[in-house]
Amino acid sequence: MAKHEMEDRGDGLVEKMISVNRVTKVVKGGRIMAFSALTVVGDGDGGIGMGKGRSKEVPVAVQKAMEQARHNMMKIKLYNGTVKHTVEGRHGATRVLIQPAKDGTGVKAGGPMRAIFDAMGIHNVSAKIHGSTNPYNVVRATLDGLSKINTPAQIAAKRGLSIEDILGVGHE
């Protein structure tokens, strides 16, 4: 069950809860019930982190997940509130396709991807999930895809060209 709650603690980070599941560990004496939480934390300017927490109580599991997400933050370079180019991310049986969108399009993404884009500050993007829609796999695949975004400087260095050649600046 995907539940997207938004919080702001005053440190400028946006916290979103992706899912909370009841999990069971079977031992010799019976079953031990616990809760597992999956969260993302973003700074609204391209920063994003994912965390998982597990505890016997929901609030403690969510708190652990938020702390882990803050610890696992990474920075993605945004371009006018969207991604610079189309990317594909994979994790397990999940494949996500993330495409840039024109200004005014909004976030066309389902499930946990919407929460990630909102926390990051991406306002115009189109995304599609192929394969498994397990929230954990979708979050990991989305972060994998976002980490593959290249800046024009990286593309120019890889091709051995100048940035002006890549962007077409000055050519008519």
Swiss-Prot record:
Q: Per UniProt, which keywords does this protein have?
A: Ribonucleoprotein, Ribosomal protein, RNA-binding, rRNA-binding
Q: Which Pfam family is one of this chain's hits?
A: Ribosomal_S5_C
Instruction: For this entry, list what GO says about its biological process.
Output: translation
The reply on keyword rRNA-binding is yes
Report whether Signal shows up as a keyword of the record.
Answer: no
The S5 DRBM domain is annotated at 13-76
Q: Which GO terms describe its cellular component?
A: small ribosomal subunit
Provide the coiled-coil residue spans.
none
Care to name a GO molecular-function term for this sequence? structural constituent of ribosome
Similarity remark: Belongs to the universal ribosomal protein uS5 family.
Subunit details for this protein?
A: Part of the 30S ribosomal subunit. Contacts proteins S4 and S8.
Domain characteristics, as noted in the entry:
The N-terminal domain interacts with the head of the 30S subunit; the C-terminal domain interacts with the body and contacts protein S4. The interaction surface between S4 and S5 is involved in control of translational fidelity.
Database matches in NCBIfam families: rpsE_bact
Described function: With S4 and S12 plays an important role in translational accuracy. Located at the back of the 30S subunit body where it stabilizes the conformation of the head with respect to the body.
Protein name per Swiss-Prot or TrEMBL: Small ribosomal subunit protein uS5
Q: Gene name, please?
A: rpsE
